Amino acid sequence: MSRSQKNDNFIDKTFTILADLILKFLPTNINAKKAFSYYRDGMSAQSEGEYAEALANYYEALNLEEDPYDKSFILYNIGLIHASNGEYVKALDYYHKALEANNKLPQALNNIAVIYHYQAVKASEINDLETAQALFHEAAQYWKQAIKLAPSNYIEAQNWLLSTGRL
């Protein structure tokens, strides 16, 4: 039984039923349908904190998915898991891959900026000011791109850019 068939709450059950109907009637090839099923199971596992299971499902979806736009969201979610596990280098790699597949993904740009900002703060704490400035600069560049794509989002980033003279 797939993970999505085990959902216990009403919203998850409703989503699962709708997703199954869409899969059944959507005129796509079998690999695209399988990829979506793995992606859906990955999202379900991720939402429950089952990151190993989520990653396994996302990797299966990634192997089956052919559409770059759809792949970008799989790659993005893999990046989210690595970031939440503190694996920032891996997270950055997957966020960049997501952007290669879909350069209109402001959430990936934002998350890259957040990681660079975090690393800059850590560098500042140990008085590595040159590294900190370089990382703050990188964060600013990615936040500017994210804000350009989604001007009403990332208000805190906009405020930081303004208050630090980077906007």
Curated annotation (Swiss-Prot):
Its main location: plastid. It is found in: Plastid, Chloroplast thylakoid membrane. It is a peripheral membrane protein. GO terms for cellular component: chloroplast thylakoid membrane. Belongs to the Ycf3 family. Essential for the assembly of the photosystem I (PSI) complex. May act as a chaperone-like factor to guide the assembly of the PSI subunits. NCBIfam families: PRK02603.1. This is Photosystem I assembly protein Ycf3. It comes from Galdieria sulphuraria (Red alga).
